[in-house]
């Protein structure tokens, strides 16, 4: 689809895309539905997504032109774009949590044009986080998989330094979670995946152990590996099966944070919550301050990059197909 190159106004910034990560959540937009379980679906229209849409929310780029009110960025700068925009005016947005805005979600690549394009118009200069000399292809995934896992792991508090985190899923998010957890000086991770190749890749990336989530005794294996049950489960898949496994593997007082959007529904005996002191919460991407923190870790060399596979922008459909088929280890990043 051909579109005219936008002209930045106000504090807007026009960037030339240098890298755009291909995220599993793009598949939901590509297919047009989210699975709610029991045969129910949420469509793009239900979510407020209008078509046609340029996808891509993991965006790195070079600043080409800025609006007259933009003072903090200049042409030639390399940046990663924070895409999870809200109304910018409500109390939630003023707290720096635009990703949780309930007034007007404006996420790039979801509700407004994203990074699968030659040029991208960023609505305000504050969303351009300077990369310095960091590799744009390696840092583009920080805008979603990076800040998502970072924000989710922070929700566990000090327990990540005391005991291993159980990570459900060894795809791009799983590999990023391993890297982020290491940068946060965590105790380590036990990774769960049904794919043997991905389990081995997780081990190669530093997991303490990797367990087949489809094994009949998977929960017993997790309980044994954690020394009596998990205190922190990060579900990067978000399916009925992974969440049920996480609950079955949880120690009393443990907590599950759900990130993945695979879909389905949860059936849980309510008495489990108080009697087991169990915590269950969702985590939706992350905030702009958290992305800046994460980029800072990368600039210090504390956060190691995950494996990225560069493909031309023209291969976006093929990249999405490969991701849907479970053939991607690490992250596919589209480049011009």
Model-derived segments and spans:
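Glycine-rich cofactor phosphate-binding loops and adjacent beta1-alpha1 units
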Residues: 156-163, 194, 200-279
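Short, well-ordered coil/turn residues at beta-beta hairpins
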Residues: 19, 82, 234-236, 336
């Amino acid at each position: 689809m051909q579109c005219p190159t936008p002209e930045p106004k106000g504090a807007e910034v026009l960037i030339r895309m240098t890298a755009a990560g291909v995220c599993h959540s793009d598949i939901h937009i590509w297919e047009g539905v989210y699975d709610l379980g029991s045969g129910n679906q949420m469509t793009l229209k239900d979510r407020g997504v209008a078509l046609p849409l340029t996808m891509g929310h993991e965006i790195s780029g070079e600043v080409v032109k800025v609006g007259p009110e933009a003072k903090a960025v200049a042409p030639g700068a390399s940046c990663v774009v924070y895409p999870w925009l809200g109304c910018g005016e409500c109390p939630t947005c003023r707290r720096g949590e635009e990703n949780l805005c309930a007034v007007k979600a404006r996420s790039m690549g979801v509700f407004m044009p994203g990074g699968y394009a030659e040029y991208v118009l960023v609505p305000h200069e504050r969303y351009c986080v300077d990369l310095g000399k960091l590799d744009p292809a390696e840092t583009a995934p920080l805008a979603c998989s990076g800040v998502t896992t970072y924000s989710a792991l922070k929700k566990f508090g000090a327990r990540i330094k005391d005991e291993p985190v159980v990570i459900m899923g060894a795809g791009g998010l799983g590999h990023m979670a391993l890297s982020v957890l290491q940068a946060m000086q965590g105790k380590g991770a036990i990774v769960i995946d049904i794919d043997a190749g991905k389990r081995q890749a997780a081990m190669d990336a530093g997991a303490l152990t990797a367990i087949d989530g489809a094994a009949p005794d998977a929960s017993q294996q997790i309980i044994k590996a954690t020394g009596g049950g998990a205190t922190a489960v990060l579900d990067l898949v978000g399916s009925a099966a992974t969440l049920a496994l996480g609950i079955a593997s949880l120690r009393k007082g443990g907590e599950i944070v759900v990130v993945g959007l695979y879909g389905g529904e949860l059936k849980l005996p309510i008495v489990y919550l108080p009697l087991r002191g169990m915590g269950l919460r969702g985590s939706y991407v992350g905030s702009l301050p958290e992305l800046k923190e994460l980029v800072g870790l990368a600039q210090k060399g504390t956060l190691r990059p995950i494996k990225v596979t560069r493909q031309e922008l023209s291969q976006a459909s093929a990249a999405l197909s490969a991701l849907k088929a479970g053939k991607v280890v690490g992250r596919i990043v589209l480049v011009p």
